[in-house]
Amino acid sequence: MKKMAIACALLSSVVASSVWADAVSSLKSRLDKVSSFHATFTQKVTDGSGAAVQEGQGDLWVKRPNLFNWHMTQPDESILVSDGKTLWFYNPFVEQATATWLKDATGNTPFMLIARNQASDWQQYNIKQDGDNFVLTPKASNGNLKQFTINVGRDGTIHQFSAVEQDDQRSAYQLKSQQNGAVDPSKFTFTPPQGVTIDDQRK
């Protein structure tokens, strides 16, 4: 009886591992179908009780694996741009731009996961698939991200994604009008406007 229990436990482990591997493979292969795109997005942030904290909107341009431009236009403008080596964050309101090396950027934020689509990033999560929904939970518990969900079609179109933090704050993003194809290279360059304070952390 004990041997049977051990065998069942081992079998369950193998099946779970296989399901996880299939989910990772499915998610990565779907995202790989679209190498570059533009989409508009809406954002809704709620706190642990479900009360609205912020709503916003903007535009997103991506060319995988390392080029992207995340432009929040409302309620306050902010820009996150990667030229493949440097990651720029610009806040026009405070007139400050921060530069960091992309290779040093954290891979445990939802947007970075989507933009990079690297196997090494996905390995850090337990992933479950339910149709077009993929639910990710970090294997390590020392980060701020509690759960990440992305809905991506078989054709690689991202419909929505959301992130739940440890304090249960939820940020949900709805993508609309995704247009696949070449993106103007200028979208992936950033030159700080004159007079802007630059915090260069590329040391």
Swiss-Prot record:
GO terms for biological process: lipoprotein localization to outer membrane; lipoprotein transport. Residues 178-203 are annotated as: Disordered. GO terms for cellular component: outer membrane-bounded periplasmic space. Residues 1-21 form the signal peptide. It comes from the Bacteria. Pfam families: LolA. Keywords: Chaperone, Periplasm, Protein transport, Signal, Transport. InterPro entries: LolA/LolB/LppX (IPR029046), OM_lipoprot_carrier_LolA-like (IPR004564), OM_lipoprot_carrier_LolA_Pbac (IPR018323). It is found in: Periplasm. Monomer. Belongs to the LolA family. PANTHER family: OUTER-MEMBRANE LIPOPROTEIN CARRIER PROTEIN. Participates in the translocation of lipoproteins from the inner membrane to the outer membrane. Only forms a complex with a lipoprotein if the residue after the N-terminal Cys is not an aspartate (The Asp acts as a targeting signal to indicate that the lipoprotein should stay in the inner membrane). HAMAP family: LolA (MF_00240). This is Outer-membrane lipoprotein carrier protein. The gene is lolA.
